[in-house]
């Protein structure tokens, strides 16, 4: 499960209280899924705990078994959706020809995910104002993972060895930014072949515009 689970939720921590049974885990999952729909459709300000519990099919009191507030739920949801993205693109790194092929496959999987979870854009964007730390964490951890993969690729000779760690960090942020807006353009605003989009973007990564 993508939500960050701890023994006790602290105000503003974005943590859900620990489910102690499989049934509790399923209930927490229902609340998170209902929150994604509610926040995605109505936005944070216009969403309500009552609306979320009605969507989830749980009692109002059940909500407070897991979360202290709407803000705490939103924070947990942002981290949960970040975890879902990680889990979705994970298979891209198994069996890829090289690091850049893995990035191509990861982008294709992300584009498919974004097409099926279009509300992720509204939720992540709103988190900049509702929970700036979660918003920053979402992007920083993503870029950090990309940069780490590129450093490993440099050691294998799959990207230029003269690129410094700082260079690869810049590349990681540029790559992530491109992926975010490709998802917005070709999965949210319009529907395009994810493989085709990923192939074209990967060509830019491999060769640039000059070749």
Describe each PLM feature range.
Residues 44-45, 159-160:
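Conserved hydrophobic residue
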Residues 61:
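Key DNA-contact positions within bacterial/archaeal DNA-binding proteins
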Residues 25-33, 45-46, 57, 65-90, ...:
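An amphipathic alpha-helix adjacent to DNA-recognition modules
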